[in-house]
């Protein structure tokens, strides 16, 4: 095998690979063995005609397609490894010379991993991130717990008041026509919650059970549906039932009912501690992100478009999987959000580019700093992932993960180590 490498543009190389005639003839014979049974030649049982007869009857090129594939599968990986080429996509293969008794020559044009010029990555200055737990946040959490533990009962008499829960049937019209998603029966709505658009809920105040009313509201300008954005609408609403909500008193008895604590003060203290931990983790994550952004701002990379497109495709697949767990699909999502595949991909582009750039920088720093994942770390990471699956035989699951996802585990571990290095060497400023 002989290989010539030509840099045809930034991050794109063309390899001209020559496979000697003897090797190519072996590939042709291999192709014959694979395809012999599908050839039907007069005078021979199907699949029993010899190679020379097949060539004469069908033409010598009949076996070239698979022979080309066999040659490329064998020689292309060796060619890129020997020339230290790191492709980011599949190559474009073009045949230059092919024929019986001739060397097989082909070109492989491929986009490569771009050069990363690291700037300063140790000692970057990043603004300190910190959060304090506000008393109001603790009170709001208590109110939320109070709401969840409220007692709800039917209001036998009287009108709808703020804070009541109304069970309604409604049907909406825009420009005098019913619209999709504008109708529901036995819909439960808390008056004053702001669930409905405009002052829909306020207009129900004062109504009694079995009474109906025409409610007039307008959709927000950016409601998210072109057919409804900013448009006035009329809803026919009928009150089916009214419920009243009784909130439990916020006292020691409440604390005992909803938690492991004996007093309200102990419950408040626990809520505050949990919030402190959450805010501390949030501050840590934001600081780490800021460090990575600062390091990225100091680096120079010309990212090939194909890398960004591939990351966008990965993001779309992730979105599709998340939707699947919710019983939805991409088509429904596009319709519901009044979007399209093109719009969603364009929206993802900036994030995709940022992800690719960050990954390239992390890989380059790992290379410079000689940061690697040890076998022990790989086992620990595989075990950590295996536990998330909830399988009975965790060790067996971890072993399968370690074998099937080794490359991903290595990247995760190495990136974590690089991030630790960057954070440890950063300078926190006020």
UniProtKB/Swiss-Prot annotation:
The protein's name is Trigger factor
PPIase FKBP-type domain mapped to chain residues: 163-248
Question: Can you quote the domain comment?
Answer: Consists of 3 domains; the N-terminus binds the ribosome, the middle domain has PPIase activity, while the C-terminus has intrinsic chaperone activity on its own.
Q: Which PANTHER family match?
A: TRIGGER FACTOR CHAPERONE AND PEPTIDYL-PROLYL CIS/TRANS ISOMERASE, TRIGGER FACTOR-LIKE PROTEIN TIG, CHLOROPLASTIC
Give the Gene Ontology MF terms in alphabetical order: peptidyl-prolyl cis-trans isomerase activity; protein folding chaperone; ribosome binding
Q: Its Enzyme Commission number?
A: 5.2.1.8
| Alphabetical keyword list | Cell cycle, Cell division, Chaperone, Cytoplasm, Isomerase, Rotamase
Sequence similarity: Belongs to the FKBP-type PPIase family. Tig subfamily.
Catalytically driven reaction(s): [protein]-peptidylproline (omega=180) = [protein]-peptidylproline (omega=0)
What does the UniProt entry say about where the protein is found? Cytoplasm
Q: Which GO terms describe its cellular component?
A: cytoplasm
Top-level taxon of the source organism? Bacteria
Role: Involved in protein export. Acts as a chaperone by maintaining the newly synthesized protein in an open conformation. Functions as a peptidyl-prolyl cis-trans isomerase.
Q: Which GO terms describe its biological process?
A: 'de novo' cotranslational protein folding; cell division; chaperone-mediated protein folding; protein transport; protein unfolding
Pfam families under this entry? FKBP_C, Trigger_C, Trigger_N
- EC top class, in one word? isomerase
Q: Which gene encodes it?
A: tig
């Amino acid at each position: 095998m002989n290989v010539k490498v030509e840099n045809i543009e930034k991050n794109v190389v063309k390899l001209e690979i020559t496979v000697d005639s003897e090797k190519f003839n072996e590939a042709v014979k291999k192709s014959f063995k694979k395809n012999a049974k599908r050839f039907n030649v007069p005078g021979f049982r199907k699949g029993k005609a010899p190679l020379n007869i097949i060539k004469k009857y069908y033409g010598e090129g009949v076996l070239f397609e698979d022979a080309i594939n066999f040659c490329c599968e064998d020689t292309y990986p060796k060619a890129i490894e020997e020339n230290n080429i790191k492709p980011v996509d599949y190559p474009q293969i073009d045949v230059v010379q092919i024929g019986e008794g001739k060397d097989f020559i082909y070109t492989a044009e491929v986009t490569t991993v771009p050069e990363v010029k690291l700037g300063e990555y140790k000692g970057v200055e990043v603004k300190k991130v910190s959060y304090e737990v506000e008393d109001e946040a603790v009170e709001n959490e208590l109110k939320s717990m109070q709401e969840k533990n409220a007692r709800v009962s039917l209001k036998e008499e009287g009108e709808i008041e703020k804070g009541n829960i109304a069970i309604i049937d409604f049907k909406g019209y825009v420009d005098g026509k019913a619209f999709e998603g504008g109708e529901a029966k036995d819909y439960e709505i808390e008056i004053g919650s702001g669930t409905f658009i405009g002052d829909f809920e306020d207009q129900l105040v004062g109504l009694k059970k079995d009474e109906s009313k025409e409610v007039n509201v307008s959709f927000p300008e950016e409601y998210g549906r072109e057919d409804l954005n900013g448009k006035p609408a009329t809803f026919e609403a009928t009150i089916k039932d009214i419920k009243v909500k009784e909130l439990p008193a916020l006292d020691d008895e409440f604390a005992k009912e909803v938690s492991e604590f004996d007093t309200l003060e102990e419950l408040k203290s626990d809520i505050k501690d949990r919030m402190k931990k959450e805010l501390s983790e949030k501050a840590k994550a934001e600081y780490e992100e800021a460090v990575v952004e600062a390091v990225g701002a100091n680096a120079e990379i010309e990212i090939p478009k194909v890398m960004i497109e591939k990351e966008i495709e990965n993001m779309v697949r992730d979105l599709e999987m998340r939707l699947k767990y919710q019983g939805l699909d991409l088509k429904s999502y596009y319709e519901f959000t009044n979007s399209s595949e093109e719009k969603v991909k364009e929206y993802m582009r900036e994030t995709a580019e940022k992800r690719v750039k960050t990954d390239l920088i992390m890989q380059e720093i790992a290379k410079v700093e000689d940061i690697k994942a040890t076998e022990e770390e790989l086992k620990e990471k595989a075990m950590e992932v295996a536990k998330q699956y909830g399988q009975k035989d965790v060790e067996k699951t971890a072993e399968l993960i370690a074998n099937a996802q080794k490359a991903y585990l290595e990247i995760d571990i190495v990136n974590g180590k690089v991030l630790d290095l960057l954070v440890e060497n950063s300078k926190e400023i006020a």
